[in-house]
Design a protein with these regions (language model features):
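Active-site-adjacent loop and "lid" segments of alpha/beta metabolic enzymes
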Residues: 15-30, 49-67, 71, 75-78, ...
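Short acidic capping loops at alpha-helix termini that bridge into adjacent secondary structure
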Residues: 166-168
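Catalytic domains of carbohydrate-active enzymes, especially glycoside hydrolases
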Residues: 29-45, 237
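Extreme N-terminal starter segment of soluble prokaryotic enzymes
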Residues: 1-4
């Protein structure tokens, strides 16, 4: 079955659940809850990357993320850290993290070095047009798929030239990161072209504004649209879906997997 990556935002200002898990105790409780709900990976982030979000200092992000990683590794589930800062990457890996999930696709100075020098961590390279502060004010122009494919291929190649094996790399088309509603759904409709590149595909539609644009639902009301988008992403080749609502997504994927199984003997 495709993997579910559960989101743990250790931030006061995330667009969906800001401040709910902004301290060590509440963050760990949320990690434990997501694990009980069936998450396969925990994705811990200490800086909001919602449209318009302001950067946080290196010191603040380290204080938010590293203590949670050190405790979460005891849960015996793969730990991903959502960061673009090389110093946070290194500290997280030293604390026991397994995956670096970078919205900048290792374009920050020193990021390629951190990941390439680590012997075993996984890395997810995401496409983002512009930067969080202004990416939705100036979204990309034209068709998204060709630009996203070219960018992700270039970033993956840069990493492999540093000696990182292809098996350690996953790609993320970056839904909602500098793209229009039409471009986001273009990425979903033609996601098979990304899957054909031969890398595991990680996709995050959870509670995104494009879902609200189509359905009229506010952020807190986007459970059903989020699960529907996750299922469509999986149907089109995503191996990992990054979500807030782990339990509902796991249940939906269980039904999806069961329906596809030719070995099922269950009868109504």
């Amino acid at each position: 079955m495709p993997k579910v990556m559960g989101i743990v935002n250790v931030t006061p200002d995330s667009f969906s659940d800001g401040s709910q898990h902004a301290n060590l105790t509440s963050a760990l409780k949320h990690c434990e809850l997501l694990l009980k709900q069936g998450t396969h990976i925990l994705d811990i982030g200490g800086e909001s990357t919602r449209p318009g979000a302001q950067p946080v200092s290196l010191e603040e992000e380290l204080q938010r993320v590293v203590p949670v990683v050190k405790e979460a590794v005891r849960l015996n589930v793969p730990i991903s850290v959502d960061t673009y800062k090389p110093q946070v990457m290194q500290a997280a890996l030293d604390a026991g993290a397994d995956i670096i999930n970078d919205i900048w696709a290792l374009r920050q100075k020193g990021a390629l070095d951190v990941v390439s020098k680590h012997t075993g961590c996984g890395v997810c390279l995401m496409h983002m047009h512009a930067q969080p502060q202004d990416m939705q004010m100036h979204p990309m122009e034209g068709l998204a798929i060709p630009a996203v494919i070219a960018f992700l291929q270039e970033r993956a190649q840069a990493l492999m030239e540093r000696g990182v094996s292809k098996e350690r790399i996953a790609l993320d088309p970056g839904v909602g990161f500098g793209k229009t509603v039409a471009q986001n759904f273009e990425l979903l409709a033609h996601q098979n072209q990304l899957s054909s590149l031969g890398y595991p595909l990680l996709v995050g539609w959870s509670r995104k504004s494009s879902l609200g644009a189509v359905t009229g639902c506010e952020v807190a009301e986007r459970l059903v649209p989020s699960v529907a988008a996750a299922l469509l992403a999986v149907e089109r080749g995503a191996q990992v879906v990054r979500v807030h609502d782990v339990e509902a997504t796991v249940q939906a994927l269980t039904i999806w997997q069961f329906a596809r199984s030719s070995t099922s003997t269950l009868r109504e």
